[in-house]
Amino acid sequence: MDDISGRQTLPRINRLLEHVGNPQDSLSILHIAGTNGKETVSKFLTSILQHPGQQRQRVLIGRYTTSSLLNAKEEDISINNEAISLIEYSRIEKELIEADSSLKLQCNNLELLTSVALVYFAKKNCQWCIIETGLAGKQDPGSIIAGQSRVCCAITNVGISDEAFLCKFLSQITESSTNKAIFLLDGSNDEFVRNTITKRCHDVGCPLEITDPSLRDYNVHTDTWGTLEVRLPYSEEEYQIFNLRVAIAVLDFLSKEKKVCISKDQLSQGLISVDWPRSLHRLDYCYESTSGKKIALLLDNANNAKAARNLACHLRTTYGDTPLTFVIAITTGKKVSPLLDPLIRPQDYVIVTRFGSVVGMPWIQSLEPVNLLAFIKNRYTRNVNMQPDLQSVWTFLETSGLKTIVPVIVCGSLYICKELLRLHNCHLPV
């Protein structure tokens, strides 16, 4: 399991934000937690909440995420889908770094990024702030918001390999029982997750709603607008209906609490116009700067069991029994079998490697490739090779004569995908 709880100390970010006036206390926060689906939920909420009712002026909706595959760090912070300018980001960051230094806190990059977001949203007087948070409970910097600032917390799908985080995440439920915050849980979660969260909410008297887990239709049932019919944009990603039900449950709650005024027509229009995120990223990866050599890749984090099953479903639908080539690195502590069982078959070829150090997150380490190689060879396929780093992977593919008629699939960790994208941008001609 990725151990972040022992190495991130939330009091540091508390003290830093207190030094700059506790900007989070002036905000109305919608927390989005979970393993899969946070981006879909937060994007849809941003799209709808910008134009409530008949108001002439757009409402300002802040959005903060650290999970996007393609974003630079300043793009993780946006208002009405417009990213903070690099100049503004750098100015706020500089002020916080100076405060951090004077207080001798030694905040890490994630804590500083979270602080920049909260300061920026407060400065711009955002009416709503959508904060995507991890599952590390009190130890997650995105979970600093407490008390009346947090209006509700939506919990998307929790991957099996992340269930151990629940014991930490549940601390948020205990704190939320003291105000009117509600928890909205994706009903498609495994029974263990549903039962665990339901029991904790019951024990502390915290309201909980669980969304419809069925796939018999793509309808969403609400108290405010009745039944809504949904058309999903990508047939291979039918699981998006679960994320959408969570997002609409948030809006339904806000409407019943008289915190927003949204018509059914507006909601229906939002279903059509929302910029749906996709988990799969196709890339003609430039792996050599001098020659501009490229290779077709398919990138997907697939860093938890549910995401791995979704990727496998797409691969089987698209490529059938065709042998596939995988490049895989996995974060130390993750359970490997739930990530690879759905994906790797005897006819596939696997190259195991590692990602480099993650700036500002020294607790994030890549699983040793030699251990991953032995696991894959014993369990899935004899067609497995080990390379010490990403650049060596492409040299091996070029010299080995291994040819594929479909894209090479890169998966297993968000960090290998981000490192690959960084290298790609460095290799592109100026």
From Swiss-Prot:
Top-level taxon in the UniProt lineage: Eukaryota
- Part of which pathway? Cofactor biosynthesis; tetrahydrofolylpolyglutamate biosynthesis
Give the EC class as a word. Answer: ligase
Leader sequence segment:
none
Q: What are the subcellular locations of this protein?
A: Mitochondrion
Q: What EC number(s) would the UniProt record show?
A: 6.3.2.17
Query: What does the entry list as the binding residues for ATP?
Result: G37, K38, E39, T40, D300
Gene Ontology biological process terms, A to Z: folic acid-containing compound biosynthetic process; one-carbon metabolic process
Going by the UniProt record, its keywords in alphabetical order are: ATP-binding, Ligase, Magnesium, Metal-binding, Mitochondrion, Nucleotide-binding, One-carbon metabolism
Catalytic reaction list: (6S)-5,6,7,8-tetrahydrofolyl-(gamma-L-Glu)(n) + L-glutamate + ATP = (6S)-5,6,7,8-tetrahydrofolyl-(gamma-L-Glu)(n+1) + ADP + phosphate + H(+)
Which GO MF terms are attached to this record?
acid-amino acid ligase activity; ATP binding; dihydrofolate synthase activity; metal ion binding; tetrahydrofolylpolyglutamate synthase activity
Which residues participate in Mg(2+) binding?
E132
Role? Conversion of folates to polyglutamate derivatives.
NCBIfam families assigned: folC (TIGR01499)
Protein name in the entry: Probable folylpolyglutamate synthase
